[in-house]
Amino acid sequence: MLKKYAVDQLKEGMVVGQAVYKEDMSVLLGEGTVLNQQMIDSLSERNIVSVEIREEDGEEALAPMPQKSQGVQGAPAKTIPLKEPILDEGYVRDYGDCFIELKSLFEVTKAHGSVDKDSAETLAQNILPLCSGAKAVAHIHNMTPKGEYTIHHSLHVAILAGLMGKWLKMPRKDQLRLITAGALILIGNLRIEQAMLDKEGVLTPDERKIMQEHPKFGHELIMAGGLGEDKEIAEAVLQYHERGDGSGYPRGLVKEEIGKFARILAIMDMYDAMASDRSYAKKRSPFEVFNILSDDIMNGRLDTDFGFRFIRRVCHSLNGNWVKLSNGEAGKIIYIDESRLAALPVVQTMDGEFMDLNLRKDVKVEYLLTSREIEEE
């Protein structure tokens, strides 16, 4: 039998149960290859998320002695991709715990009229372990949130912010502060009627004006408590809807008038909002979102360095995810060209066909499938 393992769970001696492909679509590790540490490190460096491992009687099939890779050059054999979603039970459990913790923080904030500093900082420490590269990106897309968009979106932004902090090599203290700010971007929604937050369709001009007050409301709730001593966190919540060309809100700031944390969170917020189902809009393909973000970067609305860095890292963390294609088929992402910004993926469909969407202009990715949607395919 075969079992999917995240790359960081692989051990020397495990036996590859299904071929792993290189960038040129030749085989990197052939079926039956016995893993050594060098191979495992190579998989991690290539942003490969998971590998199918051969098991016997429910236990890992460890080879008795190391062997050379049986990978071969040339076109890959036509195999059928397995449908198991990339979900780690421990990650899902820890995400659920952080979700409950964040929801409680929102409820206490609403009751007391201020954000509790200790609770917010403890939450950030609990979120930090969830910020684990490709695994974090895969789980954000593969899990199936049930309602509570405000909390899920805030938690997603916090996780993506933690990832960005690591990619920028921020000190751990600053990573935690950025996570805290990300978790609180929608805290101001507590002062907006739930019916308006849940409204389907376009907001009226008056409703839009009220909605655009939520950064101010959030800033006030932070400043009312001890967390207000950290001006950068409070500023980030106030400014994350500002844009470099002055078209944002609530103050119409431009370029360097916008704080560093706010410029980072603007990107995280846009990405997750468009890649998620909302009451008034269906989720989009991350690759479509990358194009929108790229346009905003080129037009000076989003920070150039943070924006391009985020797109490149997240784009190449999507390997191994399943997507719904515009022709109605489902496909598994098996390769994304790391040399190109926001490159389209090569996918393998359920009948084993390989499809390079950089060349197939008649087919595009509609959206990423959740674990539940994968099971229904």
State each model region's role.
Residues 1-109, 283-377:
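Terminal helices and disordered tails flanking the catalytic cores of nucleotide-processing hydrolases
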Residues 11, 17-18, 139, 145-146, ...:
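Short leucine-rich amphipathic alpha-helices used at interfaces
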Residues 25-28, 148, 248:
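Short, contiguous strand/loop micro-motifs
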Residues 70-212, 223-230:
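Acidic/His-rich, divalent-metal-binding segments that scaffold phosphate/diphosphate chemistry
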Residues 144-147, 198-206, 232, 237, ...:
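Short alpha-helical linear motifs
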Residues 157, 178-191, 209-220, 224-307, ...:
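Alpha-helical scaffolding flanking metal-ion-dependent phosphate/phosphodiester catalytic sites
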